[in-house]
Structure formats: C-alpha cells, structure tokens
UniProtKB/Swiss-Prot annotation:
It comes from Mycobacterium sp. (strain KMS). SUPFAM superfamilies: Pseudouridine synthase (SSF55120), PUA domain-like (SSF88697). This is tRNA pseudouridine synthase B. Responsible for synthesis of pseudouridine from uracil-55 in the psi GC loop of transfer RNAs. The keyword Isomerase applies.
C-alpha cells in the first residue's frame, strides 16, 4: 500500500519494547511504500504504547500533535537509582525502601501534581551546546539542564508492591507535552530519601489518540491501513471552520482570511469537507500554520 495513493494520514502504532521510535518509522516506510513518514513524540526503546505516525502529507501535522497532552502508565521502583533514571541504566545506589509507608508514597506523588518546575532527565533529547543531552550523559559527561514548567493533571498511585527490599509503585499520569516520566520517578525517590527509577512505561494516549485504536506493527505488515485519513486526523485534533467557496480558493493560494473567533489552531474545511489548511486567527487576519492542499498540488 502506498501512503501517497491515499493522500496520507496517520497510523496509531502500539510500539513494542526494544525498538526506537525511528525503528518504527523505518518499518512503516517499508509497509506503506513511501519515504515520507515521521512520528509525533519520541518513546524510549524500553517504552511501549501509542506512537502517532504520519504518512505523506500528514507528516505536516506531527509538530502540532507532538505538543498535545499525553497519558501514561508506569512503574516506579523505589530504593534504587540508575545512570539513566530507568531500567536500562547501570545501578548507581541501592537503599532499603521497605520502611516507606503507603501514606508517604501518596504524599510524595501528590506533591508533584499541578504546575511544577521539572528538571528534565539527563538522558533526554534536549540539546546542550548543539549535542543531545543523552549522548553527553552516556559519554560520562555531567549534564545540567534548566527546569521547565510542566503540568501534571493526574498522578495517581494504582498499586504498591514490596519485593526484595524495593517498593514498586504502579502509577497513572496525565500530563502536558514536555513532561518526563523518568523525572517524576526520580523526584518521588528523592522526596522519600531512597532514590527511584522507572522500570516500565506505557503511553496510553497522545492528544485525541489512544491505545484502543493502536495497531501492532505485525498487524500493519499483514494488512497496511491508516488509522485516520488526513482530513479525519485534522478534524479530530482541531476545531473546524467551514469555508465558503471564495474563502477556500483564497486559502489554497495562501491568502489570509477574516478571523473566525476560534482560539488556537483550527482546521479550515472546503465545501467538499476536505481540510485545506490549519489556520490561526491574528488580530486582523488569519495566518497559515500549515497549508495541506495548496493550489499548486
């Protein structure tokens, strides 16, 4: 199946453990027969779950979809720190944690809800002096990253298990884009004085798109299919503005329109229902965020 043949769209992939997000993109290029493939929001190799993959023209949406809220299920191990703040790193320190009470864990988790200033993980993809932080960290260099304001709408303890001197805490997280779940695990451990790292991470939602519509890669290889067409993806993710024929013609040629009074980015739909562009209101005129179907197409 060629992604170009259907005008592009998005595929919700259930990423397996052990693959990088780029590996998934490579596999989808072969499955859909096009080089024009990208993803919205990197998942580490150990992580599983929702990876939004854009095919052909839908790759233009990925930067906007990356910035949407996300949901995760994770397991935090208290009593041990690692070099990467997850199970893939080397153990740095082990501290008996079985004396930590459920109430103490609950308080430490609750303290990280709401808007917080979070120091990203040292093995994040943030650039430091032109180099990715994770590359510098894995070379043994000390990486210091500035705190960033993030929003944690939900940070809930689902289960607590005490095993071999450790405490494993299953949690659910709803958060803004840019939140590092590894950093939450680290900070809970710091608060409790025993250290902590992430042992499991599964992304359950990116914006509007959840696990309930995610395909395993093997299923896509057997039967290539889009989760949503380009138009569906736009209309599910953004408010809709219906254009008149004259407005549609102006939009195709990149000309600004009168504002619609819609907050944020919205989908500008032609009379036939196809989405021509993603627009944003300015004080006097609209501005084009992404033109999906220009007059030259």
């Amino acid at each position: 199946m060629s992604g170009a043949g259907v005008g592009g769209g998005i595929v919700i992939v259930d990423k397996p453990a052990g693959m990088t997000s780029h590996d998934v993109v490579g596999r989808c290029r072969r499955i859909f027969g096009t080089r024009k493939v990208g993803h919205a929001g990197t998942l580490d190799p150990m992580a599983t779950g929702v990876l939004v993959v854009g095919i052909d023209r839908a790759t233009k949406l990925l930067g906007l979809l990356t910035a949407t809220d996300k949901s995760y299920e994770a397991t935090i191990r208290l009593g041990q720190t690692t070099t990467t703040e997850d199970a893939e790193g080397d153990v740095v320190e082990t501290t008996p944690a079985t004396g930590i009470t459920d109430e103490q864990i609950g308080h430490a988790v609750a303290a990280l809800r709401g808007e917080i200033d979070q120091v990203p993980s040292a093995v994040s993809a943030i650039k430091v002096g032109g180099q990715r932080a994770y590359k510098l960290a894995r070379e043994g260099q000390t990486v210091e990253l500035a705190a960033r304001r993030v929003r944690i709408d939900r940070f809930e303890v689902l289960a607590i298990r005490r095993v071999d001197g450790f405490v494993d805490v299953d949690v659910a997280v709803d958060c803004s884009s840019g939140t590092y779940i590894r950093a939450l695990a680290r900070d809970v451990g710091v608060t409790l004085g025993v250290g902590g790292h992430l042992t499991l991470l599964r992304r359950t939602r990116v914006g509007r798109f959840g696990l309930d519509e995610a395909y395993p890669l093997d299923a896509l290889a057997d039967e290539p299919r889009l989760s949503h067409s380009l138009d569906e993806a736009c209309l599910l993710s953004f408010p809709r503005r219906d254009l008149t024929p004259a407005e549609a013609e102006s939009t195709r040629h990149g000309r600004a329109l009168a504002p619609a009074g819609i907050d944020g980015v919205y989908a500008a739909a032609a009379p036939d229902g196809s989405v021509l562009a993603l627009l944003e209101d300015g004080p006097q005129r609209t501005k084009s965020v992404v033109v999906l179907r220009p007059a030259t197409l």
